[in-house]
Amino acid sequence: MNKLYGVGVGPGDPELMTIKALNDINKSKTICYPGKSDDTSIAFNIVKQVVPEIDEKIKVCIDFPMTKDPFILEEAHSKITNDIKELLKKGDVALLTLGDPGVYATYSYIAQRLKADGIEVITIPGITSFSAAAAELGIPLTLADEELHVIPSSYSFEEAFKLKGTLVFMKSGRSYEKLASYIKKEKFDYDIYMVENCGMTNERLFVGAKNLPETSGYFTIIIVRGLK
């Protein structure tokens, strides 16, 4: 039976892709990736830099809905699952995802549905955006007994500041202005870092709350260290 590979391609730098990710992409008949077109799909273009022969494969662009509406999501996930089932009739399928497939990725919903239907699904982990961001900043995420909390900042984030250790705010772009304003207003005595478009050619790094920019893009990570 043909398999679905959920392939984490890392945060943006193609050199951060794993050998296993490359091998499973190469062995797959069809490559699926998020976006509206080849040109605008970040995941596809990361892979294309190191697997130029990807253009010779069957390519399917998947438009994942950016919404919290459960009805829209249910309909979309059902359609995507059925589409992948059809593609699996032709051979193995690699579904690309930015970062790691297990961290806030639509892939996980699709994988669960396919597994329930008896289809073999293999997940290939990727380097997370926040691990890469910390490396770019030259800082540790945790030391000794410090806790690490990953927060989707597109939801409520205020309560997170009551936690201890390190906070990582993902998907900060949509709520960035609100989050940055909150951090500046509260004048927290913590170490504040921000990375926009980690690993990409337009990457930007910021250190300190006072240096946070007024606006930022969707692929923004904010790291808060030193909560006690």
Please describe what each predicted stretch is:
Residues 33, 60-63, 123, 143, ...:
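Structural signal for conserved beta-strand scaffold positions within catalytic alpha/beta enzyme cores
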Residues 38-40, 67, 128-131, 200-202:
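Short gly/pro/ser/thr-enriched loop/turn and capping motifs at secondary-structure boundaries
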Residues 4-6, 93, 162-228:
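A contiguous loop/helix-start segment that scaffolds small-molecule binding in enzyme catalytic cores
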Residues 83-85, 153-158, 174-183:
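A short, acidic, amphipathic alpha-helical segment used as a generic capping/interface helix at domain edges
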Residues 72-81, 136-139, 162-166, 205-211:
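Short, surface-exposed amphipathic charged segments that create phosphate/polyanion-binding patches used
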Residues 64-71, 156-158, 200-202:
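A short acidic, often aromatic-flanked loop/helix-cap motif at beta-alpha or helix-coil junctions
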